Amino acid sequence: MVAKKAILVVFCILSLVMIGCSKVVADLGMQRKPYLGTDLKIDGYYYSEPMWKEKESFAVAVFYRNGVSMLVFLEMGQSPERDFLLNESFISDMKSKPHSIGVFSINSHSLEMENFIGRGFRHTYKSYYEIINDSTFVMKRFIGIEGSESFHNLKFKFKKFSPKPDSTSVYIR
């Protein structure tokens, strides 16, 4: 009888530990859809002008035909190629946590992205853009953690680049 109670207690403790250590991953609100359009070039990346004056940084966005997007914020002086696109450690970390990876959709001249933030697997952010032409778009709205909303007029420009990182991720369905 005592042995059965001990086994039951150990089983309960192990169950609680396993539940506590599991990763809760937020689902993206947007669905991944293949991108078949020509509204944006996808054979490279887009980089923004400097943003957030108190913290000199800029954004880099990458799009794929399978509907996956990557959006990364870098500090001024960092290289999009060296510190992001060709940095295997960063890419591996981005896919395993997840952060910065997500999906996008285009409707007429509007671009919408939803990407993981990476803080505890539970958060995503959405950003909305106006497409100017196939090599330029402007961020208009950004919705962050817990719905915090900010408005921008941040211009992104295209730079041809190859090879882009692989876009597969277990967190993108």
Feature locations, PLM:
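Lipid interaction determinants
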Residues: 21-101, 112-173
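Bacterial Sec-dependent N-terminal signal peptides
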Residues: 1-31
